[in-house]
Amino acid sequence: PTSGLFAGEGHIPLACTPDSASAAPISGGVDECETEFSFEMTVTRIYESPRVTKPYSEEQWEKIESLGHAIDVDLEKGDVRLTMGGEPTFVSTDDPDGAEWNFTAVSHKKRILSGELIKRLRGKFAPGSLLHYGQGKWYPGEPLPRYALAAYWRKDGVPIWKDDSLIADESKNYGHGAKDAKELLSRLASLVGGDPKHLIPAYEDAFYYTWKERRFPTNVTPEKSNLKDKQERERIARIFQQGLNAVVGYSLPLKRAGGGWISGSWFLRDDDTLWLIPGDSPMGLRLPLDSVPWVAEKDFPWLRQQDPSNPKLPELPKEFPYRQRFVGRAGSPTLPGEGRGQRAQKLGEKPKPLEPLPPDENPLHRPAPGQSAPWIIRTALCVEPRNGRLHLFMPPVETTEDYLDLIAGIETVVTEMGTPVIIEGETPPRDPRLNKLAVTPDPGVIEVNMHPSKTWDELVERTEIIYEEARQTRLGTEKFMLDGRHTGTGGGNHIIIGAETPQDSPILRRPDLLRSLLTYWQNHPSLSWLFSGLFIGPTSQAPRIDEARNDSLYELEVAFKELDRNINTFGYTPPWLCDRLFRNLLIDASGNTHRSEFSIDKLYAPESASGRLGLVEMRAFEMPPHARMSLAQHLVLRGLVAKFWNEPYKNDLVRWGTDIHDRWMLPHFCETDFRDVIGDLKKAGYPFEFDWFAPHFEFRFPRIGDLEQRDLQIELRTALEPWHVLGEEPGGGGTVRYVDSSVERLQIKARGLAGDRFAITCNGHRVPLHPTGTNGEGVAGVRYRAWQPPICLQPTIKSHAPLRFDLYDTWNKRSIGGCTYHVAHPGGRGYDTFPVNSYEAEARRLARFFRHGHTPGQIKIPPLEKNSDFPFTLDLRKV
């Protein structure tokens, strides 16, 4: 600093000399002395606005950590048994303009990054876990289901998959083909008790593709068909290049029987040749199961997976020995006998044959014409070579023990062969004895499904690791819009509360806890808006209960009364009643039970085991850019759960009416309301501080600019605006519904107002300032059309930009000063790309606000127009 090099960065040079020695505070010679010389220099910022890059000082974070431990103590005392999970989302830091990071859900690049991330997280959280490459959700309009990469591991610490070198790399070609697939499946069949003779080779449907080829124009070839559908074009080219007579993979009909596994035949029409259903999915999803011998509905051998809410699940076995299935004379299979498969044979041990199966249970018995065949095995394990790698498609099973037994057999075989494989297909059954961590794609983001945490320390450790490992994978937690606005990833950071087992769920044990949370969130709109994303409103991903239907609050009060009646009458509430009472209320306008601020579709839905998990998902949380900001959100919820566990919240529901989209859209009122939340937590004994959430407010309601004129101060901040889904329109080969994001809102706050002399106008219209409780201070919202798309509400209304604000002196009929806010670049420049970093984004924001631009001369403004529906907002579309 003595050279003055940092003066341009805002530092104040204390001494500037050509020679640094001449600026030294001490010079000259010294004699020996015992005096010790020391110096200290500190730099303190006079003022620092809250920022997301470093949201908390170390002193603040120590207080947050201490409070987290204190809440843990209360949760332990109350025997709450609370666990918390989450679903953080991430975007690419290298390709912000890519379609997969803005619109689409799946891409090759996203798949590679997802694979790298799941392996990193597996190494941190779950060494020895099973890495499963499965199929995820399938949404209308998407050609294939989305991928779902997951790691499963046992809570008792016993590894499921021991050798990581046997997990194939998706980016590597090992040169494996159909011959390797057949050998692997043959060895596996012999090991677990099946018969290699029951392997069925699978082929692409030659008749279908021959018919398809006959429909091509005469001037194209299958390799270059010029079809409009890119995926169809690539599929046909790939199949004809590999040949219609090439084996796609092998299938082994397999099911659990007794203490082992048995295989059988499918008695297909074409000499046991398996013609796959045309498509791009793994062969396990394309098996022609309708070609397997017919079975009457009353005789169908349904698989009944274990219930995760069963409190009597035993401990999982530490090891999985295999029984060798002994086969007597041809056509007379037996039940699994004693022994340990291939290992037993190598030791010279012979399994003893048991009694032959009766014909109505024999999987090798061919059914007569018209005869129902319930004995036919209808599940299969498939091995498919794909891009030089072997993919094993797991069959559905009933219990976790069966699944782990089969996985242990697979690892034994691939260890002997030295062949790395990829496990796909069916996932392990839902089981509280297993933990799961998953990475899945969503439109514009990659989502991580965290495993639940029991304590604050676990939650802190796991959240920080996930953020850091994502950063190492070149995935970030923030985006910048074209105009430079700083936003989250665009995805959620949903919080899931429950327990290790469904029967321990605090929501099922104390349904009044759900009532308390619902009522408190409805009473305090700041909890809905402060942590949410840009897309809010009645048709958003997480609408409030009072946004969707007008009668929701009345019906919710009836449900609360019924809940109280059951508790008072019987002393408890059965778990299914909680689902029945609230399932049809916690929905969006279309009736979707998942798209709700409080989603209970995994609480205790009776129709499936996966719906009876005792979980409540809170979906109105956007991804914050810093891990500690996310943890602060979790801490608020943990504090409220601890508070309501001891003191249920039974206040009346508030009929906000249009206020919910008027007053509560403004940051001033959200801040006031959230201060009340902090006050309630303090009264409960939890010393939260409002300053801990200043970064959240600054991130959610960024400051646009300010103006100071004659002791009057004006501040502009971004406010909230609900986006509405419009009506159906034809487009894209089907029916589409657009989202209208063309309307925006900002807040204007004025300080130093004296009486009625001064008014504030926007584009010549008086702004309806409302008192805030502080003398001389007023606040209002301005709603305006930012841009004019062809499809929106009121499409004939043009953009109101730029917004010119005047500080109007009613005595002199003049503007004494003003400022101007541009929605886009003031010079008319249209940005083609997103900002590359925060500096460019800041430059774009600063370029759109000017502290000048008032209206000159004497002006006459119209009287204030009162809007009874939205009294706090000046809607420029209506004036």
Description of each model-found segment:
Residues 12, 26, 30, 41-43:
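Short hydrophobic transmembrane-like helices used for membrane targeting/insertion
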Residues 6, 37-39:
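Aromatic (phenylalanine/tyrosine) cluster motif
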Residues 43-421, 427-444, 450-489, 500-879:
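C-terminal accessory/tail domains of diverse enzymes
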